């Protein structure tokens, strides 16, 4: 297996994307990785780009979509890493990338833990995520990255509430069997 990875794909000219991916596929790549290197993309842009690559570039290069694995690699510069990962899944990406707690250069990569929680809540994956909190704590301890109190899902204050309406919603979620959340 050969993966062809393009740097800064989301800010590239579509004609250049078509030319470079087509040539890579002709030369034997059977996987491509679409990178939002600078965290520039929006969910809508992510979907548009992936549809362009899957529906036009791959077939125009003479390949069937199912024969080419499409990866999405996103960054968090605009705070859209998780949203873009979800958009990539909805658009048919075979693989999405993420890191523990979103660790990466600049503002970081798409946080894997938040991506997994959202994919589970969307019904896309059926993984047992009961150990995900322990994983985030272990990652925090090992890589010595701060875990803010308000970090989504796993921060100490993520599900704290001070009003009756919010407290009622939390209790209802727990009754539905979402204690881990």
Region annotations inferred by a language model:
Residues 78-83:
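Short glycine/serine/threonine-rich phosphate/pyrophosphate-binding segments
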Residues 38, 76, 101-102, 157-163:
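Glycine-rich beta-alpha junction loops
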Residues 34-37, 87-109:
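Glycine-rich phosphate-binding active-site loops on the catalytic face of alpha/beta enzymes
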Residues 1-70, 86-91:
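Alpha/beta enzyme core
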Residues 125-181:
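A mid-to-C-terminal "edge-of-domain" accessory segment
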Residues 104-132:
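C-terminal helical cap(s) of enzyme catalytic domains, especially alpha/beta-barrels
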Residues 5-7, 35, 71-75, 96-101, ...:
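Generic beta-strand/beta-sheet core signal
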């Amino acid at each position: 297996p050969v993966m062809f990875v393009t740097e800064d794909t989301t800010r590239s000219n579509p004609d250049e994307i078509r030319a470079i991916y087509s040539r890579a596929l002709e030369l034997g790549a059977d996987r491509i990785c679409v990178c939002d290197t600078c965290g520039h993309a929006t969910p809508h842009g992510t979907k548009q780009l992936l549809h362009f690559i899957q529906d036009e570039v791959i077939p125009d290069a003479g390949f069937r979509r199912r024969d080419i694995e499409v990866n999405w690699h996103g960054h968090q510069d605009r705070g859209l890493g998780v949203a873009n990962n979800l958009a990539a899944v909805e658009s048919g990406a075979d693989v999405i990338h993420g890191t523990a707690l979103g660790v990466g250069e600049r503002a970081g990569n798409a946080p894997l833990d938040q991506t997994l929680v959202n994919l589970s809540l969307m019904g896309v994956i059926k993984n047992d995520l009961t150990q995900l909190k322990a994983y985030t704590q272990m990652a925090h301890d090992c890589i010595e990255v701060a875990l803010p109190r308000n970090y989504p899902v796993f921060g100490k204050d993520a599900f704290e509430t001070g009003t009756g309406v919010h407290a009622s919603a939390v209790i209802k979620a727990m009754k539905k069997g979402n204690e881990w959340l």
